[in-house]
Amino acid sequence: MNFNKLFAIVLLAALVLLGQTEAGGLKKFGKKLEGVGKRVFKASEKALPVAVGIKALGK
């Protein structure tokens, strides 16, 4: 008996049966990650002009 083929068939069957579930938990995680990205982007928008100004003064 070839274990690799059996494992591949079982894995494929599990993906087909379990792949149709809702993405509730994953969606929540994605929303949190998106919020973190927005906060980092806004903070960098505020800090970047200050950093550029300090760099210009240092020349």
UniProtKB/Swiss-Prot annotation:
Q: Which domain of life is it from?
A: Eukaryota
Does Signal count among this protein's keywords?
Answer: yes
Matches recorded under InterPro entries:
Cecropin, Cecropin_insect
Using the record, list the residue span of the signal peptide; answer none if the entry has no such feature. Answer: 1-23
Q: List the disulfide bonds.
A: none
Q: Where in the cell is it found?
A: Secreted
Q: Give the keywords, sorted.
A: Antibiotic, Antimicrobial, Immunity, Innate immunity, Secreted, Signal
User: Which Pfam families does UniProt cross-reference here?
Assistant: Cecropin
Output the GO biological process annotations, alphabetical, semicolon-separated: antibacterial humoral response; defense response to Gram-negative bacterium; defense response to Gram-positive bacterium; innate immune response
GO cellular component terms listed in the entry, alphabetical order: extracellular space
Q: In its keyword annotation, does this UniProt entry include Secreted?
A: yes
Q: What does this protein do?
A: Cecropins have lytic and antibacterial activity against several Gram-positive and Gram-negative bacteria.
Regarding protein family, the annotation reads: Belongs to the cecropin family.
Q: Any idea what this protein is called? A: Cecropin-A2
Q: Which organism is it from?
A: Aedes albopictus
| Taxonomic lineage of the native organism | Eukaryota, Metazoa, Ecdysozoa, Arthropoda, Hexapoda
Gene coding for it:
CECA2
